[in-house]
Every structure is written in C-alpha cells, then in structure tokens.
Amino acid sequence: MAIVKCKPTSAGRRFVVKVVNQELHKGAPYAPLLEKKSKTGGRNNNGRITTRHIGGGHKQHYRLVDFRRNKDGIPAIVERIEYDPNRTAHIALLKYADGERRYIIAPKGVSAGDQLVSGINAPIKAGNSLPLRNIPLGSTVHGIELKPGKGAQLVRSAGASAQLVAREGSYVTLRLRSGEMRKVLAECRATLGEVSNSEHSLRSLGKAGAKRWKGIRPTVRGVAMNPVDHPHGGGEGRTSGGRHPVSPWGFPTKGAKTRTNKRTDNMIVRRRK
C-alpha cells in the first residue's frame, strides 16, 4: 500500500493524495453477494429531508458482508481483497471448504491465499473469529458483537481496533480507540487483529467534485444563512453568530454531550476522552 501525491497538472489535481493498494481485486465483485442500493437523497417516505448533505453520486451495489462469522470449524481460503464503496475498510472474499463464499471485513495483514477459521478452537491469528472468552488478554480485536449472535457492531471502520484488557465473570472489558473502557458479554464474538486500510485517513479528495461523486452535497455555514433558516443567521455584515454554536434547530453542537442511553450506562467503565 502506497501514498501517492498527484502532480499539480490542474487545479483539481493539485491537492489530491491517493492511497494505492496493488493487492485490491481489479475485476467485478462477486455477483451473488450483491444487492441493489437505492438512493434516497436524504429524504424519508414523506419526501422530507431527514439527513442533510446527501444527494447525487455514483451508482453503487451493496455488498452483503458476513458480520456474524458463524460457520464454525469450517476453514476458508481468502480468494481476494476488494474495494467496497459502502465503507472505509476493504472487504475479503472467503471461499469455505464446503464451497460457500462470503464477504468479511478485511483484517490488516490478511492477503489472498491465507486460511481463516471461526469457532472456539480457532487459532489465535489475525482474521480468525472467536468468542471473547477464548481470546487472550492484551489481544487486539475488531468486529465486536454487543449481543451474542447479532453480528459485529463495534470497531468496523478502516484502521480501527480495540484491546481486550480484563475478564471478570461473564463480561470482558475492552479499551476502544476513543479511550472508552466498555464491558461486553464474554460470549460475544470478535475478530483478531485490526481493520485493514489504516491509511484511509491520509487521503485527500482534492476537489469538491470528488465529494459529489460520493453522494455528499455541500455544507452551508449557519452564519451565511438568513435568520429564518438558522439561529446563527442574519446580522449586518459578517458576524460570528453571537451565541454558542448550535444546530439549525437550536441544540448545542461542537462538543456538547448527546448520549441519553441510560439503559447501558453500567456497561461503560470509563467515558471516552
């Protein structure tokens, strides 16, 4: 994997920084694991905008990724590593010994030809999936379940990882990349290693149009709007908004805590930094 800075042959190329991975599959994805992905433009079934800054972009297919890793004891060979437009991480196409193929989040260091396996007796090796109670303390993991059998919900983006720091009774304690310490049921599964494509954060799209290709529309500042559109709008000349930063609906933003899920507060040993 290499970081490539483009030569400034035009204004749109001047600030482009690419991450080039020669191991990525250059052909079409595996068709039986594709699904149609419709565009919403950020609207709900009433036609109202529920998520701003969404619209346009290149057509995409959704890749059906296996987050459960529940084919226990059946070895699989990594056929290839692929690009996935729906996530920052790369995905790996596995071919199991019984002939079935599945996509998984590609772990760092795993390449075509490697053998992976799931289950309580799986070797301690990057890419293998085990219950947290069977993983040694100090191990780096990703793709962590919050409920046994539901599938991975934590630590799925490019370069992400968590560390298993303690085991007590039916729970284990994980240190997440944010600094949060969280308890998770020891029966939940996780995948060893960290997520691939850790250089993703170093890339630069270089121009506004590249953002539009991804289906992301411009973000207008509140102070550039009229008072009818935003609490920071209006004023004579250029103003700073005159109040602490808020959303278009008046809720504090930029650092205000928004967590309200008291039901799982007892699972958090230490809040994130």
Curated annotation (Swiss-Prot):
GO terms for cellular component: large ribosomal subunit. InterPro entries: NA-bd_OB-fold, Rib_uL2_dom2, Ribosomal_uL2, Ribosomal_uL2_bac/org-type, Ribosomal_uL2_C, Ribosomal_uL2_CS, Ribosomal_uL2_dom3, Ribosomal_uL2_RNA-bd_dom. The keyword Ribosomal protein applies. Transmembrane segments: none annotated. Keywords: Ribonucleoprotein, Ribosomal protein, RNA-binding, rRNA-binding. It comes from the Bacteria. Residues 35-54, 223-273 are annotated as: Disordered. One of its GO terms (molecular function) is transferase activity. Pfam families: Ribosomal_L2 (PF00181), Ribosomal_L2_C (PF03947). The keyword Transcription does not apply. GO terms for biological process: cytoplasmic translation. Belongs to the universal ribosomal protein uL2 family. HAMAP family: Ribosomal_uL2_B (MF_01320_B). Part of the 50S ribosomal subunit. Forms a bridge to the 30S subunit in the 70S ribosome. One of the primary rRNA binding proteins. Required for association of the 30S and 50S subunits to form the 70S ribosome, for tRNA binding and peptide bond formation. It has been suggested to have peptidyltransferase activity; this is somewhat controversial. Makes several contacts with the 16S rRNA in the 70S ribosome. This is Large ribosomal subunit protein uL2. It comes from Stutzerimonas stutzeri (strain A1501). The lineage of its organism: Bacteria, Pseudomonadati, Pseudomonadota, Gammaproteobacteria, Pseudomonadales.
